[in-house]
Regions:
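Hydrophobic/aromatic residues in alpha-helical transmembrane segments
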Residues: 87-91, 139, 171, 284
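Helix-loop-helix units of permease transmembrane domains in multi-pass membrane transporters
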Residues: 14, 94-126, 130
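Terminal transmembrane helical anchor/hairpin motif
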Residues: 50-52, 198-279
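Aromatic- and glycine-rich beta-strand/loop motifs that create alpha-glucan
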Residues: 1-32, 283, 288-293
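Secretory targeting signals
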Residues: 123-182, 188
């Protein structure tokens, strides 16, 4: 059976991306230096917290474990933000750039089917994201080990990062397939599409609060509404899931009241964005097939 690596590198678009980005040591070094600059900040803040703890100020933080968690959670959230913002821009010129350079027609008349072109462009865009995640991941692992973070939390963080990278790269790729120039694709992605995905959940949470407060609904219904609205933004899904887990609930279902459970936002997030990824990639393939028929 052919390995995944051989299937990927057999795609000429992916092979070309790997060949040109082997010089990516400069990129890796840049991210590594950025994280080195970030580490002293965390360590300094951790030392400050440890000093405060030694003064018996009754702060609710442990020393070494709190320092590890102080590294793990902010670093994971920052990486999630970086992936969310950088993923579309790495894919937004994938197809629009070919149209702008008038090389897309040459690509379409090759023996590569449309789905192989889209897959190759997707993997090419994910290479840089893979570099970024790989550079930061050791710091996250150190924070998880020192902070005694549960394995299920590390698993959820990994799934959130992976699905976010795929979904938001697919968003950029879909917009790129519908645009004629890189400028148009970038403006459409960061001016309309991305705000709809990122700001929409906050507006949904605000709307849920106003509606349920107006009809005098109880806290349980409000919690259900907030949890569901928070499930469509990577940051709110991660934070609300952590808060629910920290309150003593499981990582699949959280108990709001005795015998009443609510599904964790991260599960809804994964399901929704996995579907969005499949849908947008399918639409991008259809778009290329339509252009090939013209």
């Amino acid at each position: 059976m052919e390995s995944i690596w051989n299937r990927l590198t057999r795609n000429p678009i992916v092979a070309n991306a790997f060949r040109h980005r082997r010089v990516g040591w400069q990129l890796i070094a840049a991210f590594f230096l950025a994280m080195l600059a970030y580490c002293p900040t965390l360590m300094g803040a951790g030392s400050f917290l440890t000093t405060l703890l030694s003064l018996d100020l009754d702060l609710p933080l442990g020393s070494l474990s709190a320092l590890g968690q102080f590294i793990f959670y902010p670093t994971t959230l920052i990486l999630l933000v970086l992936v969310t913002l950088f993923a579309p821009v790495l894919a937004v010129g994938a197809i629009a750039g070919e149209r702008q350079r008038q090389t897309l027609s040459l690509l379409l008349i090759t023996l590569l089917p449309a789905h192989s072109i889209v897959r190759g462009k997707l993997v090419s865009a994910l290479i840089y994201l893979g570099f970024m995640i790989a550079v930061v991941w050791p710091l996250i692992l150190v924070g998880a080990v020192v902070g005694r973070v549960d394995a299920v939390e590390l698993l959820v963080a990994t799934l959130l990062l992976g699905v976010t990278a795929l979904a938001f790269t697919s968003i950029g790729l879909f917009v790129s397939s519908r645009s004629k120039t890189i400028t148009n694709a970038t403006m459409l992605t960061y001016g309309v599409v991305l705000p709809a995905f990122l700001i929409g959940p906050f507006l949904g949470m605000l709307l849920v609060t106003i509606i349920l407060a107006g009809v005098g609904s109880g806290d349980d219904l409000l919690a259900y509404g907030w949890s569901f609205a928070a499930s469509f933004n990577p940051l709110t899904a991660a934070i609300v899931s952590y808060v629910m887990y920290d309150d003593g609930g499981g990582f699949i279902l959280a108990e709001t009241t005795p015998d009443q459970y609510i599904l964790h936002p991260w599960l809804i997030y994964l399901g929704f964005y996995a579907f969005i990824t499949w849908l947008l990639l399918h639409l991008a393939v259809r778009r290329l097939e339509e252009m090939n028929e013209v």
